[in-house]
Amino acid sequence: MKRRVVVTGLGAVTPVGNTVEEFWSSVREGKVGIGPITKFDTSEYKVKLAAEVKGFSAKERMDFKAAKRMEPFAQYAVAAAKEAFEDAKIDMSQENPYRAGVIVGSGIGSLQAVETNYEKILQKGP
């Protein structure tokens, strides 16, 4: 069975840009997103470099109350999905919500945090 998939919007939170526009501009300019690790003390580790997301503000990109319950990687995914949805310019009041979806990709996330937060949501609700 063949099914059509239509990409209608794009969103990005990356080490070289926190929006699609910033990302593409950085890619065209050949910017590198790898640099010294700043999120934690690396003195006990051999690896000192990473591709960290910089300058991201959850307050500016989503409901902050919801963001406080998320790990940073989830905040990045939600912000990128929100940007993609806005980029699509679809009026969902005119669409069947069961025929729409968002594909989210993340290089890695905290599985422990996913488990912990899943349990919290089950117990307390979203």
Language model features with spans:
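Conserved "HGTGT" condensation-loop signature of ketosynthase/thiolase-family condensing enzymes
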Residues: 1-126
